[in-house]
C-alpha cells in the first residue's frame, strides 16, 4: 500500500510536464526574439556605416526603377563583361579584372540586390537578368559588342543575352557554367538551396556575419571580397541569391529554349571545364562548344569550380583568344 502511495506521488504527471515544456519553449522563443531584435538593430546600425567604410569601387547606374553597380577599368575594344555566379558579385572577378584591365576595357557588375546594387523586381529569372544587363550597358554608355565572360549560374544570363542581342555579342567565354538540362536534379535542389540561402540571409541580417566575418565567405573568395565581406556576402546578397534560386527552374527552361543546332553560328566561343568532371557534365560542356562552328572546349588542370581564381592565366588566355576574334 505504501509502495503504491509512493508511486503515485513520484510518478511524473503528464500535464505538469506539458506545462513545463511549454514554459521552456515560450522562454526560448522570447529569448530568440530578443536576441534577433538586438542583432537586427546592431546590423541595421552597422550597415549604415558600410557606405563609408566599404564604398563601391564603381558607379551606380539606373536601369529603370533601381540602380546597379557597374565597375569598368582599362581601355580597348571589344569591352569584356564579367558575369558572376549564384551568391557571388563583381568581387569574384577581382583577379581577372585587375590583370585584364592592363590591356582591355573590362566591366564587372553586381546583379540586383547583390553587394552595392539595389534590389530589383521579381521573378529573378535569366530573361529578366539578361534584360537588366542590357539596360545597364546601354544606360552606362559602354559601347558594344561585348565579350561576355560568365562563371557558373552566370552562364544562364549571358546565354540569354547572346541569344537576344546577338549583334552586341562579340564572343563567349563560359567557365564551368550551369547545366540547364539537369531539370530533375534542379527541381530537387531548388527548395533546399533556397532554404540554405534563407538561413544565410538570417545569419547576416542579425549581425552574426559581422561577429564572425568569415561565416558566409566561401574558401574561394578573392582578397577584395573578404575585405568587403559584410557588403559582398551581406543579407542583401543572400536575399538576391535566394530569389534567383527560387527562379532557377524557370531560368533553366528559358536557357534551354535558346539551344538549337548552330545557335551561335561562327561566334568565337570557349567553354572551360575543370578537371575531374562527371561524364554528364563533360557531355554538357561539349554540347555547348558545338553550338558554334568556332567553339572550343578547354579542360583546366584544376578540379576547383572557381577556375578563374585557381588558374587565372588559363581564363585570361581564352578571353584574349575570343576577343581577338
Label the model's feature ranges.
Residues 173-205:
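Flexible "cap/lid" loop of the alpha/beta hydrolase fold
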Amino acid at each position: 500500500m505504501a509502495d503504491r502511495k509512493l508511486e503515485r506521488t513520484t510518478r511524473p504527471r503528464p500535464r505538469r510536464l506539458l506545462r513545463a515544456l511549454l514554459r521552456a519553449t515560450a522562454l526560448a522563443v522570447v529569448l530568440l526574439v530578443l536576441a534577433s531584435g538586438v542583432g537586427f538593430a546592431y546590423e541595421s546600425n552597422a550597415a549604415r556605416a558600410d557606405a563609408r567604410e566599404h564604398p563601391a569601387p564603381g558607379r551606380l547606374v539606373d536601369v529603370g526603377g533601381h540602380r546597379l553597380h557597374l565597375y569598368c577599368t582599362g581601355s580597348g575594344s571589344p569591352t569584356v563583361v564579367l558575369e558572376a555566379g549564384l551568391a557571388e558579385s563583381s568581387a569574384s572577378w577581382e583577379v581577372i579584372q585587375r590583370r585584364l584591365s592592363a590591356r582591355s576595357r573590362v566591366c564587372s557588375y553586381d546583379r540586383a540586390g547583390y553587394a552595392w546594387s539595389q534590389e530589383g523586381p521579381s521573378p529573378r529569372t535569366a530573361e529578366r537578368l539578361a534584360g537588366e544587363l542590357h539596360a545597364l550597358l546601354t544606360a552606362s554608355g559602354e559601347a558594344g559588342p561585348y565579350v561576355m565572360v560568365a562563371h557558373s549560374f552566370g552562364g544562364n544570363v549571358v546565354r540569354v543575352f547572346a541569344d537576344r542581342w546577338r549583334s552586341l555579342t562579340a564572343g563567349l567565354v563560359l567557365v564551368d557554367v550551369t547545366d540547364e538540362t539537369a531539370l530533375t536534379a534542379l527541381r530537387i535542389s531548388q527548395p533546399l538551396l533556397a532554404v540554405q540561402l534563407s538561413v544565410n540571409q538570417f545569419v547576416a541580417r542579425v549581425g552574426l556575419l559581422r561577429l564572425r566575418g568569415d561565416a558566409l565567405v566561401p574558401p574561394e573568395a578573392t582578397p577584395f571580397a573578404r575585405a568587403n565581406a559584410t557588403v559582398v556576402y551581406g543579407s542583401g546578397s543572400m536575399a538576391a541569391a535566394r530569389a534567383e534560386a527560387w527562379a532557377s527552374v524557370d531560368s533553366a527552361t528559358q536557357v534551354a529554349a535558346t539551344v538549337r543546332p548552330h545557335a551561335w553560328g561562327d561566334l568565337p566561343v570557349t567553354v572551360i571545364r575543370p578537371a575531374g568532371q562527371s561524364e554528364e557534365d563533360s557531355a554538357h560542356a561539349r554540347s555547348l562548344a558545338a553550338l558554334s562552328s568556332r567553339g572550343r572546349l578547354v579542360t583546366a588542370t584544376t578540379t576547383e569550380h572557381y577556375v578563374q581564381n585557381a588558374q587565372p592565366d588559363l581564363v585570361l588566355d581564352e578571353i584574349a583568344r575570343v576577343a581577338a576574334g
